[in-house]
Amino acid sequence: MAGEDLEVDGPQYVPLEIDMGVCVKPGYFYSDIARELLDVFSNRVLPDGRLGVFHPDNFSFGQPVFLSSLIATAQAVTGVESVNIKKFQRQGIDSNEALLAGSLTLGRLEIAQLDNDRNFPERGVFTLERG
């Protein structure tokens, strides 16, 4: 547009902290289930071509993260008996508000991020525990 100034705002990535307790069905090994869950909740393209839950292509500006979809995804993994989310929050902000509400809301320029990379913990952390 001639004579008009246009300002474009970039995304603001919001790192998440999620702690998930998992009970494993009899006949399955926790280590196998944990490895599968870490893959499923990754930010990578999985060997079978699926995208990990926190792959950047799965989230857009202002899109909330729903607790129910995380639980359903975990329970869909073969060998998972039950799932208990213990922490579901923005990183560094100790609050159970999103856990109680069942969703983490984001602003119009915010995008959820959870890389779970030990070298870059400031990009979100996903922790698995027994039970």
Write out the residue ranges for each language-model feature.
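Acidic, low-complexity glycine/serine/threonine-rich segments
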Residues: 1-131
